[in-house]
Amino acid sequence: MELQFLGTGAGQPAKHRNVSSLVLKLLDEINEVWMFDCGEGTQRQILETTIKPRKIKKIFITHLHGDHIFGLPGFLSSRAFQASEEQTDLEIYGPVGIKSYVTNSIRISGSKLPYQIHYHEFDDTSMGKILETDKFTVYAERLAHTIFCMGYRVVQKDLEGTLDAEALRAAGVPFGPLFGKVKNGQDIELEDGTKIFAKDFISEPRKGKIITIIGDTRKTSASVRLAKDADVLVHESTYGKGDERMARNHGHSTNMQAAQIARDAGAKRLLLNHVSARFLGRDCRQMEKDAATIFENVKVVRDLEEVII
């Protein structure tokens, strides 16, 4: 499981940062990639990666400001040009209005999509659990931006314990149907009367990962709830230390506020993105140092950076 950041800037493209987009790579888990936001130039950024557009099966939009959605029509159209590859349907999750934006853009531009898009729109009355699959559950809450904006909490369901095949063979169990029974948690008895207890050969279930992705927002308790015990919290940091009033006036957060959210939520790791273009390399290192006085495991991410979860 990996995160890759396609755009980490705020507001408009800059030389060193594109606007908002990131992907959650779930190739080993479900052979899919999930995208979060799709700002202008996202498809160009994808060309610098190993991501295959047809693997992107779900897109989650945090809000309808242009730096988070202006790349969506272009990406959807380019995804359709992959005639040599299997066309797969796509699901888009986001605030009310995202369907109208996409369908009108496709219609007005005369674009044709050879795959279906299934829309899931949300408002204040439909927050909470928004998606559940065999392996993942996704929750959403409203944040505190200048327009309706959502944060997402992706919860991987607990993983089954693994079978210690070598120990089972050493205990005299032949590979075959009996192996399968033990793997499924059944106790068995061998021909010589030896009893094999499945619990002795299967490890304890492993806790699934939690990934929280916070859209544009002022500091809010909703962010703490979404980030509770998260393995990774991705939080916007449009502003730096001392800019709290400006951040509040514009519906954004500082690095220090993001660190407070991570600390209060008990998150394990904080990744700061949506960084203003005025913050360059040295400034970003200072942002990390300042935030680390509140929450130690913090990093300002860069475009195209990959993070293993």
Swiss-Prot record:
- The identity of this protein, by name, is Ribonuclease Z
State one Pfam family annotation. Lactamase_B_2
**For binding Zn(2+) 1, which residues are annotated in this chain's numbering?**
63, 65, 145, 216
Cofactor annotation comment: Binds 2 Zn(2+) ions.
Which NCBIfam families does the UniProt entry name for this protein? Answer: PRK00055.1-3 (NF000801), RNase_Z (TIGR02651)
PANTHER family in alphabetical order:
ZINC PHOSPHODIESTERASE ELAC PROTEIN 1
Binding positions for Zn(2+) 2? 67-68, 216, 274
User: Its Enzyme Commission number?
Assistant: 3.1.26.11
Classification via HAMAP family: RNase_Z_BN
Catalyzed reactions per annotation: Endonucleolytic cleavage of RNA, removing extra 3' nucleotides from tRNA precursor, generating 3' termini of tRNAs. A 3'-hydroxy group is left at the tRNA terminus and a 5'-phosphoryl group is left at the trailer molecule
What's the superkingdom here?
Bacteria
Membrane-crossing ranges are: none
Q: Which cofactor does it need?
A: Zn(2+)
Q: How the protein assembles, per its UniProt entry? A: Homodimer.
Q: Hydrolase among the record's keywords?
A: yes
Catalytic site: 67 (proton acceptor)
Q: What are the entry keywords?
A: Endonuclease, Hydrolase, Metal-binding, Nuclease, tRNA processing, Zinc
One function term, GO molecular function aspect: 3'-tRNA processing endoribonuclease activity
What the record says about family reads:
Belongs to the RNase Z family.
What is the role of the protein in this entry? Zinc phosphodiesterase, which displays some tRNA 3'-processing endonuclease activity. Probably involved in tRNA maturation, by removing a 3'-trailer from precursor tRNA.
